[in-house]
Amino acid sequence: TRRMGYWIDMKDPYITYDNKYIETLWHLLAELYKKGLLYKGYTIQPYSPAAGTGLSNHELNQPGCYRDVKDTTCTALFRIVRDQQSERLFKGVDGDVYFMAWTTTPWTLPSNTALAVGPAIRYVRVRSFNPYTGAPLTVFLAKDLCPAYFPKKNEDLPMDGYEAGGKNVPFRVEGEYVGKDLAGIRYEPLLPWIAPDGDAFRVITGDYVTTEDGTGIVHIAPTFGADDDRVAKQSGIPPLVVVDRAGKRQPMVDRTGKFFRLEDLDPEFVRTHVDAAAYGEFAGRFVKNAYDPTLSEADPTLDVDLCMKLKFEGKAFRIEKHTHNYPHCWRTDKPVLYYPLDSWFIRTTAVKDRLIALNRTIDWKPESTGSGRFGKWLENLVDWNLSRSRYWGTPLPIWATEDHGELKCIGSVA
């Protein structure tokens, strides 16, 4: 170590599994607990099915964790329910009207319970054809993104005589709306395998909806996205959950990264909430091939099979490959999911401003490290997910009564 220029105390080393070190951590955790900065939360977190544990924001931002991957994407068609509230959207239309929503994770579509629009974004109603089936259809999407799906040169093409598969799909823009005016409109579930409890399948507004890509309409699956969960709660949208054999409410995907098998669900829940025939076709399938040791990258993915089902049912407008940046687990090198988990957190956001101020007092070498990577991390700070589902490491010194009516945080073995 001397030749390496590495300073280390070999006589009294810093070892994380040493009881003195663990007790020091217990003391610090107890102090945080007294100050109300240590809490248990049920939130959407980065989760590694391959490692079987949640990951912290810091772990996810290590070099190399985000990488470009090519996935199957789908622009899905959500049929609007025609009722008194939506009647104005059907003016001059004989058939059905749809919302178009794009996703890079088609496996989350069965868990959809809402669609989000930008309150100030302008949307257009377009009359055209389904390029896969050739059937006439009328759709809503953001005005700024209309050219990505309906090139201007096709606007003057004749509307009669179009055949499925034709590259140039004729269209007409028939109306313009503001996002906030679409809020509350109901639509039919895209894949009605499992019935959620509560007021689902309606349009809500979201402050994070943009017109940078997609259609300007965001598919919301509250169990698999932090932003989805936040805007859904704000609008009273329920998540789509299943009930397992132990009576616990779970997302449709289990901890290993696959759709729950029917035999692992509560029989009464299956009887009252599940279309067993439709869901059974995909039950037990892994959402990513990387989680299944029997599959390779060359095997068909769940995303592809779901997209083909939607295409066959006339519920897909565009299916294509798309390269995007996706997080991977630094331990297993496999993709992570955003997943609802019980975890213990340190409320770092409560001292965010002070952390940023103190960071500016540090004489970083080079300076760009402090203002760049570390500074940006502090600016986007979230509460620290502290707990891990593993058998090594420092045990959390928190004890609770069976009814969780009383909690104690032990700060010392003494």
Model-derived features with residue positions:
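Non-cofactor substrate-recognition interfaces
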Residues: 1-11, 16, 89-99, 106-414
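Gly/Pro-rich turn-and-neighbor structural signature
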Residues: 11, 18-66, 71, 77-83, ...
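Conserved beta-strand residues within beta-sheet cores
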Residues: 52, 73-77, 103, 184, ...
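Glycine-rich loop/turn
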Residues: 70-100
